[in-house]
């Protein structure tokens, strides 16, 4: 009888362990990723969550080369996600992954919210790389580059959001 109780107990522990493992965060990150990395000998340290939530920068935006989507170079982002040209995604050198940003093309006023899920661009003077579809929606796909403003909206799984000023309402009676 003791042996049967022991087998049942061990089985329950094994089932509980499997259930717990299946509920953990996918893609190897717990909410967000701020691990330092190195590309071509250059060291990059992603911003902390608090620093990222105040991030608001203007600079040059570019878009991923489409040939890398359809050739042998098709691959995964830094989070291990598949890259497809129709996704509205972006890459940034120092923002924690993933995060949501609003990119505004300052040449034409168009803006778009997108998910940053990769590191890059690694070309001097550029602040963000967007997918071909995002570049088309922002109106700079033909030009290749644009002056853009990048504002962080949230970091990670959405738990960390930029605080917006509360609107004050005046009531007149």
Which role does the model predict for each range below?
Residues 23-173:
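Secreted/periplasmic proteins
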Residues 1-21:
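Sec-dependent bacterial lipoprotein signal peptides
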């Amino acid at each position: 009888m003791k042996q049967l109780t022991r087998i049942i107990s061990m089985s329950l522990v094994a089932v509980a362990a499997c259930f717990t493992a299946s509920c953990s965060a996918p893609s190897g990150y717990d909410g967000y990723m701020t691990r330092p990395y190195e590309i071509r000998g250059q060291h990059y340290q992603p911003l902390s969550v608090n620093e990222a939530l105040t991030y608001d920068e203007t600079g040059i935006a570019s878009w991923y080369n489409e040939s890398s989507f359809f050739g042998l170079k098709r691959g995964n982002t830094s989070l291990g996600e598949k890259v497809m040209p129709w996704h509205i995604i972006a890459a940034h050198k120092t923002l924690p992954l993933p995060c949501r940003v609003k990119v505004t093309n300052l040449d034409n006023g168009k803006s778009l919210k997108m998910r940053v899920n990769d590191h890059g661009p690694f070309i001097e003077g550029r602040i963000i790389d967007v997918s071909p579809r995002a570049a088309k929606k922002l109106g700079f796909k033909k030009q290749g580059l644009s002056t853009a403003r990048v504002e962080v909206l949230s970091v990670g799984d959405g738990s960390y959001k930029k605080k917006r000023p509360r609107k004050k309402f005046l009531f007149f009676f």
